[in-house]
């Protein structure tokens, strides 16, 4: 298997060099055509997706991530059209100067080359990644999870068909075999893959970071907090907490821990009351338990263990932590945060400013839901993931983050003195 994969990676590198010659207009035409063709291939994609769904335990919270339906395919097509409508990130002059010796220097944005993505049960990522990589002039190597194998195969078949219709080398997109051995080859593919982005659980991200010889950008895992301050607006907090927890509980920007000022414990039952309608399980500290006992459904209320405050639930579960003041809230968040998205509900401007300055995360919110951590919501188009590291990219990784740069230098015979 290794030799076959390496040969295919040779082909991908060759295709990436061809992409440099494509105009933005040609790329946009292909992306729009792909979006238009999704409805025509909807039946095949959904049938393949159903095969994947049937292989997964229905109680697994990953089912929602795996699921495709007509509405989600329409949303995917809309995201692809949006990517096509965005300005190209390539050939932008980032910096320019003329040296005293007359040399003209320009720093311009260019493709990374070949970008590898390792991801779990998220077949929509296959579309998103291809659109972003093509728009930014990059070839793509995908290693999807075995849970989404049939869905990914059907999607890649459609993309390859559209590439061929537009006269573009289909090796621009390569879907690795589902076997584990393929991931090991990918992680060691120095000289073939320029950057690898893992999308999925913390376990997956840790594995890729610890085992890859190719540069890695960490994305994904979100242990997300919302702090309800002593000055927090009750109605605003109620709707924000409900949205952040229940809109799509299986995604990385969903709320995991509500941190509440002890002087507002009397309002806790009101803040979490709407969560009952979605059967949200609460894992709460002693102070919160005393407040909620007898109000929140007994079957859904549990006393928290230490591990509940460091868990990305990805389901209808949430922990609650009581703190004495802002400093204690900040300390709790610093201890358990994955540096993804954090929020405060407060009306005191000084408190908000302190929180937003001191919290170390890719995205920090005041008085709104963490569900907005998303490339499309930021006006960036679809994103490859949410980077939780600080080098190269942080937050939603969209088109600009899919490029690097090079220096172009023009002279008229200058030589450097000895």
Curated annotation (Swiss-Prot):
It comes from Chlorobium chlorochromatii (strain CaD3). PANTHER family: DELTA-1-PYRROLINE-5-CARBOXYLATE SYNTHASE (PTHR11063:SF8), GLUTAMATE SEMIALDEHYDE DEHYDROGENASE (PTHR11063). NCBIfam families: PRK00197.1, proA. Pathway: Amino-acid biosynthesis; L-proline biosynthesis; L-glutamate 5-semialdehyde from L-glutamate: step 2/2. One of its GO terms (cellular component) is cytoplasm. Belongs to the gamma-glutamyl phosphate reductase family. GO terms for biological process: L-proline biosynthetic process. Its EC number is 1.2.1.41. SUPFAM superfamilies: ALDH-like. GO terms for molecular function: glutamate-5-semialdehyde dehydrogenase activity; NADP binding. Catalyzes the NADPH-dependent reduction of L-glutamate 5-phosphate into L-glutamate 5-semialdehyde and phosphate. The product spontaneously undergoes cyclization to form 1-pyrroline-5-carboxylate. This is Gamma-glutamyl phosphate reductase. It catalyses: L-glutamate 5-semialdehyde + phosphate + NADP(+) = L-glutamyl 5-phosphate + NADPH + H(+).
